[in-house]
């Protein structure tokens, strides 16, 4: 059972009715004792106040029993609350994935005839095509710039190393390598830390949250895209243990969000197209297509992109959306393939389907037998354990960063330090290695000879002195004997910790390729070891085990199964290994989940995001809507005084975003629910002065169209920017035409799983709780549901924090 220690009201505090309460109704039963799950009596209840600041010294409201009786009210005393995963942030708002079916919406829908409906559908397909084209072009730009900048850097360093190997003074080569890496990473980190912090990392957790219904500030803005693309180029060229494939998912999502709106709010340009799609519901579907197009461009895997969007991203799905997402993915792959083929001088040879090409695995030369399946499962176990270790280390590292490295300047210094350490460690390992291999048959672009004989190269450099994508291909396809076990073991150990340290830096970067590279290294080592131990012919090609190890390691870290299986199959152009890859990924996920969550889910929790999973906690049937709902609720009347509305919207302590509308009755009679209206709608109504004087109630207030609301979307002005005179405060606003007259409601006795299923499946933002007389008694929001989760000790309730 849950240890429910706090009950946090929707408004963040309990308030008595103030003057003017007859016009502004606060419903609910704050004086009634709410049963506790642990059986504690009324005396054990704590205050509703539970507002904290994470990682900062700020004013907080503490529970009454925690206060020193000799001190003044808590507002004057700061307290730092250590950040942990058992906090839920109040700063995140929900997106409106349920259309408000008010009179304006219904009138517009009724006016749409069959021809207009077909036009809207055609526009959806056109937008998906544009998403695919632009995502593919962005991927081409990233790939070409990285190839040229990284090539220039490695050529300069190689020439310097070759020069000083003969005459001595390789320390200067080390200094040059570390300086170049740090310089690139410095620029990449500065633009992220100081201009757009949301562009840090791969962006996959943020896009998952957006598609789940959480409004992440700036996550799909044009500025974020520019910083993301620039940052990932500089991170990869800077030699960090990162990849450019993960951020393509975020980039595709931003492109989709921008194209589908037909305007740029950042550039203040409105092209007057696609106005019908200016709402969260439509934008969500296009962002799903953008995420899939990003995967498709990264790996040349259009089907894998669709499945990734389904498995990891989209919370809401339908058949027509599947077709459009697949179409966008195919267009993205083709665009990338076509442009890169032209760039490489083979205009009609479409041989570059993705940013990374794993190369073709020959089924005849690398066939597997039934006896190898247990070996593959064992590799999945290893991948799950190593993935759990990776995630656990990254968890503690992220906690340290949240507490101590939260200033932008410190974040930039850390990124530069990691870049310098990565270059230093790579140089030392290459310098110390005596693993020399013949140049003939090598796939190295920049072979380093160092102390090897003429015609040979240092094999440790094949892993370190290259972009991560090329290193993965080298481990997959270099012939047997290209690496000795000591080289692979050292590389795996060192790169594992470097990748773990790198993920979470304030740079734009992904974890896909580093995970594949780590897994390919220990997988190849695994195959070599089996060959030594058994001497059997079936163990002959270590590239096969490098592929399985790569899948196991990536699956153990991110815990994807279905989509990753198809991505690996499409990227290798080989269906033969579909079954063993699936076994490896499933085993890695099962083993990893025993110890810790996947990397993306872990970082979502660390950011205290109110993320709703597919199902409610399995042990939550004992909870009802009455126990989880927020009370008291601020309600408005059908015809409300403008001054009351302005005061409600200006209340920064509550920051309400949805208001039940009740019937106009006397103060002595209970008010029944009539509808629901959003803060954003009220803002637009106030901006356009949609009200009349109380003395002239017979006048008709100004009419608005849906276009007026869409023009204000998505950056609705704050209430502070709207001037309302004292005379206007006495006017009256009729909400009947703008409220949603049929909001979803549940009775107080509804179980939490039932409430959760309704809220989650319909993409709701507010769910009204009513009694037997249809009177509002509470409101269920995303945070009310997200704060209950299944912990190691059973059902637990998270604390709400103002981060």
Curated annotation (Swiss-Prot):
Q: Which family does it belong to?
A: Belongs to the chloride channel (TC 2.A.49) family. ClC-7/CLCN7 subfamily.
Which tissues is this chain's protein expressed in? Liver, spleen, kidneys and brain.
* Pfam families linked to this entry: CBS, Voltage_CLC
- Residues forming the motif Selectivity filter part_1 are 201-205
| Segments for region (Disordered) | 1-46
Annotated binding of ATP, by residue: 656-658, 781-784
Annotated function:
Slowly voltage-gated channel mediating the exchange of chloride ions against protons. Functions as antiporter and contributes to the acidification of the lysosome lumen and may be involved in maintaining lysosomal pH. The CLC channel family contains both chloride channels and proton-coupled anion transporters that exchange chloride or another anion for protons. The presence of conserved gating glutamate residues is typical for family members that function as antiporters.
Q: Which residues carry this modification: Phosphoserine?
A: 9, 799
Q: Which UniProt keywords apply?
A: Antiport, ATP-binding, CBS domain, Chloride, Ion transport, Lysosome, Membrane, Nucleotide-binding, Phosphoprotein, Repeat, Transmembrane, Transmembrane helix, Transport
List the GO molecular function terms: ATP binding; chloride:proton antiporter activity
Site note Mediates proton transfer from the protein to the inner aqueous phase applies to 312
Name the record gives this protein: H(+)/Cl(-) exchange transporter 7
Q: List the disulfide bonds.
A: none
User: Which residue positions does UniProt flag as site: Mediates proton transfer from the outer aqueous phase to the interior of the protein?
Assistant: 245
Catalysis performed (reactions): 2 chloride(in) + H(+)(out) = 2 chloride(out) + H(+)(in)
Q: Where in the cell is it found?
A: Lysosome membrane
Motif segment (Selectivity filter part_3): 510-514
Record PANTHER family: CHLORIDE CHANNEL PROTEIN CLC FAMILY MEMBER (PTHR11689), H(+)_CL(-) EXCHANGE TRANSPORTER 7 (PTHR11689:SF136)
What topology does the record note for this protein and the membrane? Multi-pass membrane protein
GO BP, one annotated term: response to pH
> CDD domains given for it?
CBS_pair_voltage-gated_CLC_euk_bac (cd04591), ClC_6_like (cd03685)
Instruction: Give the matching InterPro entries.
Output: CBS_dom, CBS_dom_sf, CIC-7, Cl-channel/antiporter, Cl-channel_core, ClC
